[in-house]
């Protein structure tokens, strides 16, 4: 490649990097807000369908992501380290503070050039998470940097059975490592083949087969391509609404 070609490639890469606000050390520029003081468990589940993030293993440090980050639910359960850009906003940012949040919700767009509109990178955080990096009294928005990090979870991966009749759906939560799930397959004890599940919404996956009265095994692949198989994690006596754990087997 001649020097002109090398220069062109360099310029293209530089423009691509600047377009998403990426820094040379891996941090990406974004903005953050918080969605109020009502952080009861029932108010934090959101578009990922976790219902109660505390029961799902995520605690109070959660966030709704803009569409650019949420990716139609693919980021549900993923972890992000967020720090306030103190040099850009020393009045409201806490110097050197960072917090790790779990993606549990979607921050919707609006017709008023909102912060969550595409292609913006934005975190609408729970107030406990937000005030780990910003001063209290701030009711506006702060500039931040973020990066994707591994999730540290206690206990095993959790499988919550949902649906009714022969409509089977499972909500997968408390996932360590990469945190966010790319694909799921299920196998009942009466069958020999894995059935590929489809994302119904958020962290909820559905299958087309009737799996009632069977022990269930799941093959879970994360967005970082790591896969684990959880054999017979759900007993044949399962019913809708019950949650089962992989008993310590976890992604790292």
Swiss-Prot record:
GO biological process: anatomical structure morphogenesis; plant-type cell wall loosening
Leader sequence residues: 1-23
The UniProt record lists the keyword Cell wall biogenesis/degradation: yes
Subcellular localization: Secreted, Cell wall; Membrane
Pfam families reported for this sequence: DPBB_1, Expansin_C
CDD domains: DPBB_EXPA_N (cd22274)
The UniProt record lists the keyword Membrane: yes
Entry GO CC: extracellular region; membrane
Family matches, as SUPFAM superfamilies: Barwin-like endoglucanases (SSF50685), PHL pollen allergen (SSF49590)
Keywords, sorted A to Z: Cell wall, Cell wall biogenesis/degradation, Membrane, Secreted, Signal
Location (main, coarse): secreted
Disulfide cross-links: none
Chain ranges of the Expansin-like EG45 domain: 45-156
InterPro entries documented for this protein: Expan_Lol_pI, Expansin, Expansin/allergen_DPBB_dom, Expansin_CBD, Expansin_CBD_sf, RlpA-like_DPBB, RlpA-like_sf
Domain Expansin-like CBD: 166-246
Membrane-protein topology: Peripheral membrane protein
Function description: Causes loosening and extension of plant cell walls by disrupting non-covalent bonding between cellulose microfibrils and matrix glucans. No enzymatic activity has been found.
Homology family: Belongs to the expansin family. Expansin A subfamily.
UniProt protein name: Expansin-A12
Lineage summary: Eukaryota, Viridiplantae, Streptophyta, Embryophyta, Tracheophyta
């Amino acid at each position: 490649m001649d020097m002109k070609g090398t220069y062109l490639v360099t310029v293209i890469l530089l423009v691509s990097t600047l377009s998403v606000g990426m820094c040379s050390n891996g941090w990406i520029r974004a903005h953050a807000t918080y969605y109020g003081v009502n952080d009861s468990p029932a108010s934090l589940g959101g578009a990922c369908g976790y219902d109660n993030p505390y029961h799902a293993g995520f605690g109070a440090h959660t966030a709704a992501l803009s569409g650019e980050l949420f990716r139609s639910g693919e980021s549900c359960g993923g972890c992000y380290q967020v720090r306030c850009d103190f040099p850009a906003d020393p009045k409201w940012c806490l110097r050197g503070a960072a917090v790790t949040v779990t993606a549990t919700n979607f921050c919707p767009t609006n017709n008023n050039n909102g912060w969550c509109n595409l292609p913006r990178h934005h975190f609408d955080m729970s107030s406990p998470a937000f005030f780990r990096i910003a001063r209290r009294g701030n009711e506006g928005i702060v500039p931040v940097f973020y990066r994707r990090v591994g999730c540290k979870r206690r206990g095993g991966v959790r499988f919550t059975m949902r649906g009714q009749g022969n409509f089977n759906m499972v909500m997968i939560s408390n996932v360590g490592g990469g945190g966010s799930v790319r694909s799921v397959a299920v196998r009942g004890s009466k069958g020999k083949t894995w059935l590929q599940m489809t994302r119904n919404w958020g962290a909820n996956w559905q299958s087309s087969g009737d799996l009632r009265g069977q022990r269930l095994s799941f093959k879970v692949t994360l967005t970082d391509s790591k896969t684990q198989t959880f054999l017979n994690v759900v007993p044949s006596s399962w019913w809708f609404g019950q949650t089962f754990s992989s008993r310590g087997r976890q992604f790292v």
